[in-house]
Regions:
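Alpha-helical scaffold segments
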Residues: 1-117
Length: 117
């Protein structure tokens, strides 16, 4: 039985993702933010994107690192912080801040996730 393996990440892949991240359309930038092979520096740059959809895509990216999630835990938009609250890679210090979040839904989502772990 063969197993599926993801193709190797090439310089070409990274260049295409960088081009997508600069696209004027937020949906295209969000697709770059959600990509599993997007390099960390690209993801961190997208954390500054003005469009909430892009930052939500970052917070939902299964391969997002703890440092990026810690940064997104301070996002001005509550829906981004809610996605950070449910991400399994969110570090403890970010969870502690989210537990004191001004938005009751962020706190509720975090409490629900924490109680189920």
């Amino acid at each position: 039985m063969s197993t599926f393996r993801s193709p190797e990440v090439t310089g070409s892949t990274v260049r295409r993702l960088a081009a997508l991240a600069r696209d004027p359309r937020p949906g295209i930038r969000a697709s770059a933010a959600a990509h599993r092979h997007a390099p960390a520096e690209l993801l961190h740059a997208l954390a500054e994107d003005e469009d909430t959809r892009v930052r939500v895509a970052l917070a939902r990216n299964a391969w997002a690192g703890p440092d990026l999630l810690d940064r997104l835990a301070g996002d001005a938009v509550a829906v981004v912080r809610r996605w950070v609250a449910v991400h399994p890679n969110t570090p403890a210090q970010a969870r502690d801040r989210l537990a004191q979040d001004e938005d009751p839904q962020v706190r509720a989502v975090l409490a629900m996730v924490t109680s189920s772990r």
